[in-house]
């Protein structure tokens, strides 16, 4: 379902069988209401525009058209909604089935700075207690870099050159 949103839009979900729509139906309106791209995707989009602008200067014949640039903006919003759908559906299912301590492991994108799934969990279960752990990469390991502060309650600090998988 998130893939359908990322390559198309939220309307793509309405074409899913009714049985599938039960999984995301409760959060669909919330996701549809998102009008601003997530800063993570906005940053990626801005980098693409910068590369495009430099490319435009060196190869004007291959420059992105205004239509292509608008499509890039729309794609950024679709990606934001797709990630929001994942977070909202995960949160809805956790909130509906939570009976005790629950450990949910996911990538930083989904929980850093109290965003992503945490936003939805707090909406669906306002009294929920959440503790987050975030992995950060930095050169100096003895002290948390100020840019990493506020991402989580606890940190796993690794050297910048640590191999990463996505």
Which residues does each predicted region cover?
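A substrate-binding/cap region within the structured catalytic cores of diverse enzymes
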Residues: 1-97
């Amino acid at each position: 379902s998130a893939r359908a949103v990322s390559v198309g839009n939220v309307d793509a979900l309405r074409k899913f069988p009714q049985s599938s729509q039960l999984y995301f139906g409760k959060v669909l309106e919330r996701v549809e209401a998102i009008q601003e791209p997530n800063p993570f995707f906005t940053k990626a989009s801005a980098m693409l525009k910068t590369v495009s602008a430099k490319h435009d200067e060196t190869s004007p014949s291959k420059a992105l058209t205004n239509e292509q640039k608008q499509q890039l903006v729309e794609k950024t919003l679709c990606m934001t909604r797709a990630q929001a759908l994942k977070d909202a559906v995960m949160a809805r299912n956790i909130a509906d089935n939570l009976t005790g301590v629950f450990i949910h492991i996911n990538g930083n994108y989904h929980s850093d700075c109290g965003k992503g799934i945490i936003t939805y969990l707090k909406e669906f279960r306002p009294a929920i207690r959440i503790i987050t752990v975030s992995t950060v990469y930095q050169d100096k390991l003895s002290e948390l870099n100020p840019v990493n502060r506020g991402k989580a309650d606890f940190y796993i600090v690794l050297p910048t050159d640590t191999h990463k998988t996505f």
